[in-house]
Amino acid sequence: MQPDFLILGCLLCIVLVLQILALLRRSDHTALDHVLREEHRVGRAELREQLETLERQQEVRLASFARSLTDLVARIDQRLDQLTASLGEDARKGRQEASEGQQRFADALGQRLTELTQRNAQSINEMRTTLEQQLHVLRADNAQQLEQIRTIVDEKLQTTLNTRLDSSFKLVSERLEQVQRGLGEMQQLATGVGDLKRVLTHVKSRGTWGEVQLDNILDQTLTQEQYARGVRVCPDASEIVDFAVRLPGRGQYEAPVWLPIDVKCPKEDYERLLDAQEQADQELVRTMGVQLERAIKIQAKSIRDKYIVPPHTTDFAVMFLPTEGLYAETIRRPGLADVLQREYRVVVAGPTTVTALLNSLQMGFRTLAIEQRSSEVWSLLGAVKSEFGKFAGILEKAEKQINTVGKSLGEAGRKTRTIERRLRGVESLSQEQTQVLLDGLDVDTAESDVDSDASF
């Protein structure tokens, strides 16, 4: 290919030289210019033809080279495929051989382990059988000897302990029953105290009116024996109070003292005060407040004059106001509560406060009952303490006897083992001789039992 390029270059140089000469002589040699132009055209045509020929040759050579390259790539791919298949087959054979070798090794190892396991299990079973037989024989001998000793000891201890423990437990049971009855009564009192606490923290009856509301509160708080309805507090008078709480007298047989509780509800005066407060009329509010105070004082004076009659009643009474709002307004009035307590000896109470007051009285009743029964419980506990002291002494004696028997059993076991060691080489007797010796031992045992009973 290089000579062709050299020829083509030379031709191009000649054409350029001719063109330069033609340009230099254009003005004087027109004919020559025409000739040169024709030759130049012919030269370009020849040059184009040569270039096309050269291009075709190059294409033919390139096509041949491409076919050769394609054939070479195909042969290389075929060779690589053959090589890959050969390597894969070799690897598969290697893996198969390795797997077969591992399997043979695992089978041999498993068989060896199985044989070792079977031999060990057989040896262990033989050892276990031998030990069980020896232990069974030893256990049977010990059990027989200990059973004989235990039978004798149990008979003695059972007779003595049953007699003494029965008498002691009978006496203690009687005392404990008395204590249990006393504690049961105290538990009932404690339950009542719990009910009292629940009522103090969760009062259900609120916001109702008059005597029905107070009756419900009394019924929820006190028992029927602790209060009464429509009580004539003074035998010489005809005034009857709505409700009265029965307080115990100073002595056991003295008449009860009544705590009067009267229901008062100046509803009209309170409603007029509420209307004035809604109208925001300060002067009217002040006037209605004064009227409410006057009505409360009139009711307190009426209670004092009618129902406070010492010694038949307490030296004060309770005015029950059925609504919390009326009670709060009464307490809120400056100095009104103090005047009622100091001048009229009347305590104002609403639904909540009267419940708290009644609960306090209920607590006092329960405390009084506990005080009355505490001396009985204390005496009973003293008797139980004395019996427990005796019972502790009996248990201590029984413990000493049981310890003595345990030591005797331990000593008998040690002597039994010593005798067994020494009798290993002794020849066994016949059945008749053995029975005769055992009968002799029974006689000796009976005599020792008689001696032991005498010692107990």
UniProtKB/Swiss-Prot annotation:
It holds the Pfam family RmuC. Disulfide bonds: none annotated. It comes from the Bacteria. InterPro entries: DNA_recombination_RmuC. The keyword Coiled coil applies. Keywords: Coiled coil, DNA recombination. The keyword Glycosyltransferase does not apply. Residues 36-60, 106-158 form a coiled coil. GO terms for biological process: DNA recombination. Involved in DNA recombination. Belongs to the RmuC family. This is DNA recombination protein RmuC homolog. It comes from Xylella fastidiosa (strain Temecula1 / ATCC 700964). The gene is rmuC.
